[in-house]
């Protein structure tokens, strides 16, 4: 490994020879980042991306001004899927160093898991990785159950079984219980539900290549809520939380589900399948039914659910939906505290009725007459939340993954959302 490039911070502008827009300058001592007080964390992250682009793979964050948030901003921009990078961190106090180390361990796990090829990460592997991560930080405070394949059908998890049955890799439901109280009768404070589609071809409503080539990342919601629970535990979460991951491949085969199929759920709802590429809501429904049965104060589901959310927000914000204004406000406050981007999109009672079917209570996709795709998807999910008007948040994870690099991020997963959900759980 070459000698480390020193990276220092300055509140003074760069020498005029670097140009009036210069955010960093280079001299014999290393690289100086010139902070302007307007968006220092963003500036550090963008500069780190440029430094990585120069091929510099070993750096030392040196001098005054570095704290955990600034170190983390640098790492978010510096990390990329290919190659090895080494950072020598500055001296931080014990609390800040522990916070940074936990982010590096858990959010890097989220990014690396989302970036993993689908060939390496099937439904069972995703569930087991989640168990391993949370067990590592929680120890014997965790119990879990994994249900897969035909056992899902026999136990009534018809959405998950239907979507996953077309793959040779069995669909899996992970039900994990983090209970720090030691009391088996302790109330459940929150339930987290994640969409874990480890590859999404679209099924018989097949995707074009340009829309399928990033679908190893369609389990981003599951990775995000797993990371959020693990991170909340490192921050001292002392309440009981349950995690439900709905994991499957959505593939084409002689046994795959088809348009016109009708799924009957355990809560009695019948759903007509009119788009096999709207599979995420079908698997989440099973997880939300289980979550509702726990009678928690709060249910949070996370899913890379719709292209409509990305159309509205790009990859820059996660989309938030809720009927509960107070709870939505709490999550947005958590996002602000953690410097993570969330934006609330509309969800109203009428969205719940914009999925009409001639053969069932619900259609799994909106018609051309109801084009608000992200809102109608949230409306669909609300039918599987017992008390949907209070205590439920739906996150459409549009900021989870980038197909191409931008000035702040490499291509691939971002890890955004983990800290916000953890903040809300521990508030």
Curated annotation (Swiss-Prot):
CDD domains: Peptidase_M17. GO terms for biological process: proteolysis. It is found in: Cytoplasm. Keywords: Aminopeptidase, Cytoplasm, Hydrolase, Manganese, Metal-binding, Protease. One of its GO terms (molecular function) is manganese ion binding. The keyword Repeat does not apply. It catalyses: Release of an N-terminal amino acid, Xaa, from a peptide or arylamide. Xaa is preferably Glu or Asp but may be other amino acids, including Leu, Met, His, Cys and Gln. InterPro entries: Leucine_aapep/pepB (IPR011356), M17_PepB-like_N (IPR047620), Pept_M17_PepB (IPR008330), Peptidase_M17_C (IPR000819). Signal peptide: none annotated. The active site is at 207, 281. Its EC number is 3.4.11.23. GO terms for cellular component: cytoplasm. Probably plays an important role in intracellular peptide degradation. Belongs to the peptidase M17 family. PANTHER family: LEUCINE AMINOPEPTIDASE-RELATED (PTHR11963), PEPTIDASE B (PTHR11963:SF20). HAMAP family: Aminopeptidase_M17 (MF_00504). This is Peptidase B. It comes from Escherichia coli (strain 55989 / EAEC). The gene is pepB.
């Amino acid at each position: 490994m070459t000698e480390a490039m020193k990276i220092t911070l300055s509140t003074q502008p760069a020498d005029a020879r670097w140009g009036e827009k210069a955010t960093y300058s280079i001299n014999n001592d290393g690289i100086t980042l010139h902070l302007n007080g307007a968006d220092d964390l963003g500036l550090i992250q963008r500069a780190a991306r440029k430094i990585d682009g120069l091929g510099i793979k070993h750096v030392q964050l040196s001098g005054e001004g570095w704290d955990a948030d600034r170190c983390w901003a640098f790492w978010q921009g510096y990390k990329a899927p290919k190659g090895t990078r080494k950072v020598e961190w500055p001296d931080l106090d014990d609390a800040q160093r522990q916070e940074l180390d936990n982010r590096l361990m858990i959010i890097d796990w989220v990014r690396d898991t989302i970036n993993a090829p689908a060939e390496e990460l099937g439904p069972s592997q995703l569930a087991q990785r989640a168990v391993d991560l949370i067990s590592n930080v929680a120890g014997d405070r965790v119990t879990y159950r994994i249900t897969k394949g035909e056992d899902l059908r026999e136990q009534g998890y018809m959405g998950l079984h239907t979507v996953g049955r077309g793959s040779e890799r069995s669909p899996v439901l992970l039900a994990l219980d983090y209970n720090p109280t030691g009391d088996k009768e302790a109330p459940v404070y929150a339930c987290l539900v994640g969409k874990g589609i480890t590859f999404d071809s679209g099924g018989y409503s097949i995707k074009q290549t340009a829309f399928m080539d990033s679908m190893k990342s369609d389990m981003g919601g599951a990775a995000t809520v797993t990371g959020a629970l693990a991170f909340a535990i490192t921050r001292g979460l002392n309440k009981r939380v349950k995690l439900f991951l709905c994991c499957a491949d959505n593939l084409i085969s002689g046994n795959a589900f088809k348009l016109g199929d009708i799924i009957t759920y355990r809560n009695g709802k019948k759903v007509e399948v009119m788009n096999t590429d709207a599979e995420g809501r079908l698997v989440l429904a099973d997880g939300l039914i289980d979550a509702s049965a726990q009678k928690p104060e709060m249910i949070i589901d996370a899913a890379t659910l719709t292209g409509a959310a990305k159309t509205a927000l790009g990859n820059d914000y996660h989309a938030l939906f809720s009927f509960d204004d107070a709870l939505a406000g709490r999550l947005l406050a958590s996002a602000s505290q953690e410097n993570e981007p969330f934006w609330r999109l509309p969800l109203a009672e009428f969205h719940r009725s914009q999925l009409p079917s001639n053969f069932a209570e619900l259609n799994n996709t909106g018609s051309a007459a109801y084009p608000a795709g992200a809102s109608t998807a949230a409306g669909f999910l609300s039918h599987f939340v017992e008390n949907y008007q209070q205590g439920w948040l739906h996150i459409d994870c549009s900021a989870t993954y980038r197909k191409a690099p931008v000035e702040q991020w490499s291509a691939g997963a971002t890890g955004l959302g983990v800290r916000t959900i953890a903040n809300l759980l521990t508030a």
